[in-house]
Amino acid sequence: MDRRRFIKGSMAMAAVCGTSGIASLFSQAAFAADSDIADGQTQRFDFSILQSMAHDLAQTAWRGAPRPLPDTLATMTPQAYNSIQYDAEKSLWHNVENRQLDAQFFHMGMGFRRRVRMFSVDPATHLAREIHFRPELFKYNDAGVDTKQLEGQSDLGFAGFRVFKAPELARRDVVSFLGASYFRAVDDTYQYGLSARGLAIDTYTDSKEEFPDFTAFWFDTVKPGATTFTVYALLDSASITGAYKFTIHCEKSQVIMDVENHLYARKDIKQLGISPMTSMFSCGTNERRMCDTIHPQIHDSDRLSMWRGNGEWICRPLNNPQKLQFNAYTDNNPKGFGLLQLDRDFSHYQDIMGWYNKRPSLWVEPRNKWGKGTIGLMEIPTTGETLDNIVCFWQPEKAVKAGDEFAFQYRLYWSAQPPVHCPLARVMATRTGMGGFPEGWAPGEHYPEKWARRFAVDFVGGDLKAAAPKGIEPVITLSSGEAKQIEILYIEPIDGYRIQFDWYPTSDSTDPVDMRMYLRCQGDAISETWLYQYFPPAPDKRQYVDDRVMS
């Protein structure tokens, strides 16, 4: 699968996509910022100019694959690439008084073949100068790079950038843009996790997926003492161009990004993904198939959370299915959605390399009216933690035609917890396992005679305690099969309630079973809605095998 090869490369931060055709547009611009490393011609720049660039670029043909890299860069191993360090003494804002933020650039090489141009902007005068590549900006250490091949390659460009925050101004970055239109940020743990993208195209269609590139960035010079910076980006691909403005707030416990984009379609697009995010789910409390390791859980995110336009909150636990699955959840002007990592307990992961208990959640908050569309969720089978296998995005209902223009505004929260949560009872965890026996007899002296699958969903918060004396009723809807042995159990350690039921098949079908449940008290909903997709085994696997040897 092309997507899998791309994502595997991105684990080494590699992205192989098409080149930009903006050189003539830059040369036609009239473009200075006070920066020791900016050495290009002075040019005028603001967001309206960038929008015009993107609009005009969409009227021209996409130039296709990137040009070849010098051999010394093209053949690098991930280990060699990672040993290249940017010289912190030549950072973008090194000379800013009382700087709280600083920026460094990533070197081209390995899978990073797309030239990305960098510009420094004086926000007061709207003048910019390009920062050209030169080997003296980097420390090559033991990377084995033949720097003679790089002499005179001022147009080589960079692969991306990252931003550091005081007091870790040259040691631990908090924001990173690297590869295609991928970018990431951290919370106060400094632990990277899932990624966002500028745009997704044809993620789940009969066409080959397209990965647009950010091909140029313009940085407003950061103000003394500021923890907020603004960077502009030009996006380019075979089907679309875009002008992006990122206002990024590097707060104490989270990073917040205000994003504004203006998109210009070159071609008809079957599936346009707005504010896409990419994560990894190998196994968790609900999905144990790939957990034959010392780690109880392995995932960057454990659920998709949605706050629908009608006010309903939905929790959709993630899966690692045996077959690729794509689900689309319709909505009208969504209030927010995101891939969340809410389980922060180290003992639930036992991982001192990945530190999954520290990985951030990502929440999207639309800032203008997005209209009708769907939240798409793609879950790809994976054998482990080295491949991102979860994709989520907003797809507008209206088909995209060549020449169409769009504008979206949204806010991204990179934090341990989303900025908002359901005021009703919330899903804490989902567990699945063998069914068909009374709780407390697991499974008893012998296996159950009839096969079933048990589901246990824990709810916490809201007004559960007040509702309990009046009666809590789980409302369960299944696309196939039957729910039996339904129990409501109070769980003192979490001060919440567990809804437990066994699913029994009513046919031999192995089609996914869509499950939906919420809690009701005297006719009123008192919880968010739990959605789940279960994949029944083949009929000949619906039996328990007693493999004990008693003699």
UniProtKB/Swiss-Prot annotation:
Main location: periplasm
GO biological process per UniProt: beta-glucan biosynthetic process
Localization (cell): Periplasm
Pathway(s) it belongs to: Glycan metabolism; osmoregulated periplasmic glucan (OPG) biosynthesis
Position of the signal peptide: 1-32
GO molecular function: carbohydrate binding; catalytic activity
Pfam families reported in the protein's UniProt record: MdoG
UniProt keywords, alphabetically: Periplasm, Signal
Source taxon at top rank: Bacteria
Post-translational modifications reported in the UniProt record: Predicted to be exported by the Tat system. The position of the signal peptide cleavage has not been experimentally proven.
Similarity comment text for this entry: Belongs to the OpgD/OpgG family.
Chain's role: Probably involved in the control of the structural glucose backbone of osmoregulated periplasmic glucans (OPGs).
Protein name per UniProt: Glucans biosynthesis protein D
The encoding gene: mdoD
